[in-house]
């Protein structure tokens, strides 16, 4: 990896965030964490991550809503990591803009392989700039 990828983990469970932080950092990734949907969206706008890992069960808003709002201004890959295991829930997330879906509990080796695969599809440092456009007015986030 010629440049360190930045991964934003949005999950309300501190133990999961810690486990992912340690696992991802051991592979050379820079990890940013958020415990709520609103905090995650703000971090995404500020840090411009190369990959977003998103839990769907957040305390302040549903992860599907986070995904919809994130997709309004970013094409960065999103890996959903959730206990929601039904086919319908997976399809909804994937059709809603997620690039991949992993169900909790999960194996870390498979998770890391999926992270690598998503980062290969969207080279590090080529994350879309965060901006909102309203008619002729563009707001750089």
Regions found by a protein language model. Give the residues of each.
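Short, Lys/Arg-enriched segments at the junction into DNA-binding effector domains
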Residues: 3-8, 117-141
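The feature encodes the CheY-like receiver
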Residues: 17, 59, 86, 104
């Amino acid at each position: 990896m010629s440049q360190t990828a930045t991964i934003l983990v949005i999950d309300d469970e501190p133990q999961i965030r810690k486990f992912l932080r340690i696992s991802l950092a051991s592979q050379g990734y820079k990890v940013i964490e958020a415990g709520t949907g609103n905090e995650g969206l703000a971090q995404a706008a500020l840090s411009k991550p190369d990959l977003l890992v998103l839990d769907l069960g957040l305390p302040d808003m549903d992860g599907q809503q986070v995904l919809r709002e994130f997709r309004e201004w970013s094409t960065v890959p999103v890996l959903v990591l959730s206990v929601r295991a039904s086919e319908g829930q997976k399809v909804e997330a994937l059709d809603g803009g997620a690039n991949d879906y992993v169900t909790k509990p999960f194996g870390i080796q498979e998770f890391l392989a999926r992270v690598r695969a998503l980062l290969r599809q969207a080279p590090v440092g080529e994350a879309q700039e965060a901006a909102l456009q309203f008619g002729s007015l563009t707001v750089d986030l």
